[in-house]
Amino acid sequence: MGRTLESKKQIVKKIEDLLDNSEMALVLDYKGLSTKEMSDLRSRLQQSDGVCKVTKNTLMRQAIKGKNSWTGLDSLLTGTNAFVLIKGDVGSAVKAVQAFQKETQKSETKGGLFEGKLLSQDEIKAIAKLPSKEALMGQIAGALNSITSKIAIGINEVPSGLARSLKQHSESGES
């Protein structure tokens, strides 16, 4: 028995809500994956604020209709698709998908969309090589800490230098 029109509308609404909260989408061919493997992928994605949604291409097409930033997905909507929607740490979510694909050897990334731009395989791999948000924040914090330390040392050096000069001058005046 097929789905009713009302249940299809609810599914489309849920997909629209997921898309509204997502920064990036990947389209995977999930043919040949077991339920256990799909559950494994979903649990890996939870850690990086991503979700894996399996839905009919026609329902996804309805969800992206009128959303300019997502219409690029339309060209990828053929075959058996799982949609990875990422709202948090894009780099670590892509890494999780790639690690999963490497382990299972069953799934393939058809493409992706980030900020309205259709991504090639190379661009998706490049995103995976980016450091995580936490690593970037650590690098920025380290750089800021370094700058403030150098400023503090520089400010402290002015009176110290003046004191050394005065001491040297007074010692040269005594002899």
UniProtKB/Swiss-Prot annotation:
Transmembrane segments: none
Entry superkingdom: Bacteria
Keywords per UniProt: Ribonucleoprotein, Ribosomal protein, RNA-binding, rRNA-binding
Classification via CDD domains: Ribosomal_L10 (cd05797)
A biological-process GO annotation: translation
Molecular function as annotated in GO: large ribosomal subunit rRNA binding; structural constituent of ribosome
Any Gene Ontology CC annotation: large ribosomal subunit
Keyword presence, Aminoacyl-tRNA synthetase: no
Pfam families per the UniProt record, alphabetical: Ribosomal_L10
Disulfide cysteine pairs (residue numbers): none
Subunit (UniProt): Part of the ribosomal stalk of the 50S ribosomal subunit. The N-terminus interacts with L11 and the large rRNA to form the base of the stalk. The C-terminus forms an elongated spine to which L12 dimers bind in a sequential fashion forming a multimeric L10(L12)X complex.
Family according to the record: Belongs to the universal ribosomal protein uL10 family.
Alphabetized NCBIfam families for the sequence: PRK00099.1-1
Function: Forms part of the ribosomal stalk, playing a central role in the interaction of the ribosome with GTP-bound translation factors.
Name of the protein in question: Large ribosomal subunit protein uL10
Primary gene name: rplJ
